[in-house]
């Protein structure tokens, strides 16, 4: 078995391997850090490489923390019945992973989101690492596995739901019975797919 396979097996169920202790010590530092922070190298090298990461110029890895659970809605100031306040049990039509990708893209407007993966969670928040690519960098333009990102059609991928997590949230990972309202898009079918 290769080194990547050992790492992959350890991360499958972190609670049953050495990853549990690593995460426990790492999260103590992560909680004190800003919500979006650039990291020198990926925490999960196997997953990062599987999703397109290479240790070369023009590629950046960012760790993003996002709150867990449903949407945090402000309480209305004027009087209302408690049943009609609409504060609790309100969920976004978007996964937390997509929110993490969008925040990373907003922090680094000159970079495009390639992909992202989970690295940890506690009772309050989840952490994702987002792979970002500089589409104007010469080493990216000359690399066949990345230069498709240089086209204008891939601008703002994260906010348009064109990443892997975005397509999953839009229902484009599935086909057949039950997905009639998913294509061409959710909005084209008056949001009946959601």
Swiss-Prot record:
It comes from Methanococcus maripaludis (strain C7 / ATCC BAA-1331). The keyword Ribonucleoprotein applies. GO terms for molecular function: RNA binding; structural constituent of ribosome. PANTHER family: LARGE RIBOSOMAL SUBUNIT PROTEIN EL15, RIBOSOMAL PROTEIN L15. GO terms for biological process: cytoplasmic translation. Belongs to the eukaryotic ribosomal protein eL15 family. The lineage of its organism: Archaea, Methanobacteriati, Methanobacteriota, Methanomada group, Methanococci. Pfam families: Ribosomal_L15e. It comes from the Archaea. GO terms for cellular component: cytosolic large ribosomal subunit. Residues 160-194 are annotated as: Disordered. Keywords: Ribonucleoprotein, Ribosomal protein. This is Large ribosomal subunit protein eL15.
């Amino acid at each position: 078995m290769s080194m990547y396979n050992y790492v992959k097996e350890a991360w499958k169920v972190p609670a049953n391997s050495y990853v549990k202790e690593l995460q426990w010590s790492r999260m103590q530092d992560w909680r004190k850090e800003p919500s979006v922070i650039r990291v020198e190298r990926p925490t999960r090298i196997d997953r990062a490489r599987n999703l397109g990461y290479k240790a070369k110029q023009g590629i950046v890895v960012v760790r993003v923390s996002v709150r867990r659970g449903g949407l945090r809605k402000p309480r209305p100031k004027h009087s209302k019945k408690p049943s009609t306040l609409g504060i609790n049990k309100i969920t976004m039509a978007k996964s937390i992973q997509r929110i993490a990708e969008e925040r990373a893209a907003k922090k680094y407007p000159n970079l495009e989101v390639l992909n992202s993966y989970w690295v940890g969670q506690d009772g309050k928040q989840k952490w994702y690492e987002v792979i970002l690519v500089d589409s104007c960098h010469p080493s990216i333009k000359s690399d066949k596995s990345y230069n498709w990102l240089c086209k204008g059609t891939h601008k703002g991928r994260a906010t348009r739901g064109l990443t892997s997590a975005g397509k999953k949230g839009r229902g484009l990972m599935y086909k057949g019975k039950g997905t009639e309202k998913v294509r061409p898009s959710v909005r084209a079918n008056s949001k009946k797919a959601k």
